[in-house]
């Protein structure tokens, strides 16, 4: 293996020598007197600490195309300022999540050194009507532990049947003179919101503020701490709080707030977040990947949340890219957790009555997302082990009544936006709907039980969700059992 020197020697399971040594010593010490155990523990800790983490390498590239074709080109290769924050014993991703998947392979031996699944803005954009009429280019990045010898970057994408197809390969030589090793100054002070341990053994979650002026930096920190508390009051994050480090970065903005083009508001914010992504007034994204990476590289991170300093309802979340939320909205708590579910665990949207920019799927294939199914074979349902024997598949619920009420609600919501009514009126409508839906779902025969409830992934028919209610479906405050398990699986991939 060709990572930095301390990680070259591994066992057959891919465990680096220091970690393997520590495990063997620990197993042996269980049989030793306490004094000897204590001495050997000190030696083990000291020896393990002597091995430094590799550097963090980032491949910035351009992703160009239309709904039917796509091209890739290298932008630059960067060595980020901080060491690799991840666990080198968990370099390989076996979760099979994401629309895309990349591998870092030793060019000589073809051994896979690192891999991760992910989704992208391009992957969403190519399903919109705009992608049928024109081409666009998006900046994207892949981050991985810096190798010491040439590697191949292999990128795969799911085809229409959800099989992986190789779509791009490029070679990186870490000794190339054009690898950018410049030391860039941080644009913001790193705030340790919650530090539970070494980044290599924890999930590292970075919260970035956008649209906060220099006078509002204390507000950012208060917002970040408030929403962090919300996340860790929600299961299963609550039970795994000690597995997370949380960091904050907030470069000062020249003006307060972020862009909202549909209302004529434009801001040159540090990270470039904006409402109206893909023409959806509530969808908040940044298309400026360079700006995001310039800020983020000064913190140890695997996951990013961008807090937009705005009141208007909105947010977004893309698996293994980032999530966003309008920090001042009355439903920021819900949006923060919901969108982080997308970003962190690849959870699908389970709702289907709200308007979206994406075109409907031409055929029903089994989704890669862990909380949605096409139910092509009920006996092979991916969460079948959580279904009680007396729960029918598909699982009945008052779908027609829900859809009738939801149509009326969406009409009222659209009128509030069209009339440019105050955000407080929209929040009042959301509270009214939340109260109504909560009572309706709790009255369901199969409430709180895992089954297969039709209606998910923006489609009324053909896709099914695990429970009648979940934070990925409505504005409730909890994840369903299937989503909780999916989240815990990702926590395990990044912590120990």
Give the residues covered by each predicted segment.
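Bacterial N-terminal signal peptides
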Residues: 37-47
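N-terminal prosegments of processed precursors
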Residues: 51-139
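Extended acidic/polar, glycine-enriched regions
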Residues: 132-199
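Fold-level signature of zinc-dependent metallopeptidase catalytic domains
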Residues: 177-235, 248-258
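Short pre-active-site segment immediately N-terminal to the catalytic Zn-binding motif
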Residues: 219, 316-339
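Active-site-proximal segments of metallohydrolase catalytic domains
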Residues: 243-319
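Catalytic Zn2+-binding segment of zinc metalloproteases
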Residues: 340-356
């Amino acid at each position: 293996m060709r990572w930095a020197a301390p990680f070259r020697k591994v066992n057959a399971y891919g465990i680096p020598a220091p970690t393997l040594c520590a495990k063997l010593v620990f197993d042996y010490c269980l049989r030793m007197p306490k004094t000897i155990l204590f001495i050997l523990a000190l030696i083990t800790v000291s020896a393990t600490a002597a091995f430094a983490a590799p550097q963090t390498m980032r491949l910035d590239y351009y992703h160009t195309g239309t709904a039917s074709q796509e091209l890739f080109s290298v932008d630059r290769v960067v060595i980020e300022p901080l060491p690799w924050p991840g666990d080198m014993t968990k370099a390989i991703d076996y979760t099979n999540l994401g629309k895309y998947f990349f591998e870092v392979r030793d060019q000589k031996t073809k051994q896979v050194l690192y891999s991760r699944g992910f989704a992208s803005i391009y992957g969403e954009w190519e399903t919109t009507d705009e992608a049928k009429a024109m081409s666009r280019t998006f900046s994207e990045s892949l981050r991985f532990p810096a190798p010491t010898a040439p590697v191949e970057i292999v990128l795969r994408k799911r085809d229409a049947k959800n099989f992986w197809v190789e779509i791009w390969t490029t070679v990186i030589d870490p000794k190339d003179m054009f690898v950018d090793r410049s030391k860039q100054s941080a644009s913001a002070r790193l705030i340790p919101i919650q530090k539970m341990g070494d980044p290599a053994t924890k999930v590292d979650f970075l919260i970035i503020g956008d649209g906060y002026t220099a006078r509002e930096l204390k507000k950012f920190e208060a917002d970040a701490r408030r929403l962090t508390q919300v996340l860790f009051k929600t299961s299963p994050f609550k039970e795994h709080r000690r597995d997370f480090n949380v960091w904050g970065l907030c470069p000062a903005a020249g003006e307060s707030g972020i862009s909202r083009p549909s209302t004529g508001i434009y801001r040159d914010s540090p990270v470039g977040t904006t409402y109206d992504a893909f023409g959806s007034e509530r969808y908040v994204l940044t298309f400026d990947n360079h700006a995001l990476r310039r800020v983020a590289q000064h913190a140890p991170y695997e996951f990013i949340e961008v807090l937009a300093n705005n009141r208007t309802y909105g947010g977004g979340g893309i698996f293994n890219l980032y999530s966003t939320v309008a920090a001042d909205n009355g439903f920021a708590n819900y949006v923060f957790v919901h969108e982080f579910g997308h970003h962190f665990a690849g959870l699908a949207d389970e709702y289907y009555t709200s308007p979206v920019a994406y075109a409907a799927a031409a055929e029903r294939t089994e989704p890669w997302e862990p909380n949605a199914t096409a139910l092509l074979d009920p006996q092979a349902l991916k969460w079948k082990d959580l279904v009680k024997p007396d729960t029918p598949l598909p699982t009945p619920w008052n779908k027609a009544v829900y859809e009738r009420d939801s149509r009326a609600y969406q009409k009222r919501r659209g009128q509030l936006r069209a009339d440019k009514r105050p955000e407080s009126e929209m929040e009042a409508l959301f509270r009214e709907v939340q109260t109504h839906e909560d009572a309706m779902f709790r009255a369901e025969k199969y409430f709180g039980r895992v089954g297969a409830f039709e209606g998910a992934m923006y489609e009324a028919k053909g896709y099914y969700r695990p429970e009648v209610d979940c934070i990925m479906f409505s504005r409730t405050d909890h994840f369903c059992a299937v989503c909780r398990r999916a989240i815990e699986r990702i926590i395990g991939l990044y912590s120990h």
